[in-house]
């Protein structure tokens, strides 16, 4: 069996999430997800909130917070980086909190600085250069980010600068080679990150909704890498 032929929807998993958590809960439907400790700290400082539970990991618990904004109950948590970890945590966060709509944003590398400079980036499709998505959907080069147009509508409504394009999701941050970058650019990719294709695959599988966008950080457009805004927070 080829390594990419890992999608098995003919038999059931041996590990069920109910083995790890006593009860399934519902607190709110919409959950905001950030990858930034700085954003988490700002959230805790500026919004009245309470922890409604956590996802357990060997690195320590990931707290899930409930808060209200404009009389609507919302959830928030800080996700680990990478498609494999972030997708597993999302599934467990759903079980702990009841969330099915996930607003996920974070930084990305820029493959086309002319198109992306000073703009938010809305992925239309994600190149599946990671492992987890192949366990949740049939093999393909790209997965469609199905709520792309909804993000576009919101950004247009509030006159936010943005660009729409394909994104490259990778597990191998230190193997973003010149040839790979050029190939992804030829296919229409404007950004590179580490989560979106995996998150979209798991959302498709479980019937969740993903709303994702990025802000530019480092630049991989050309022969040399530029740190640019890497490490900057939004």
Report residues per predicted region.
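His/Asp/Glu-rich mid-to-C-terminal helical/loop segments that flank catalytic regions of hydrolases
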Residues: 220-234
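A C-terminal functional module that forms or caps the active site or interfaces directly
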Residues: 179-211, 215-219
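Glycine-rich beta-alpha junction loops
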Residues: 36, 109, 168-173, 198, ...
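Hydrophobic/aromatic beta-strand patches that form the interior of the parallel beta-sheet core
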Residues: 77, 103, 121, 163-165, ...
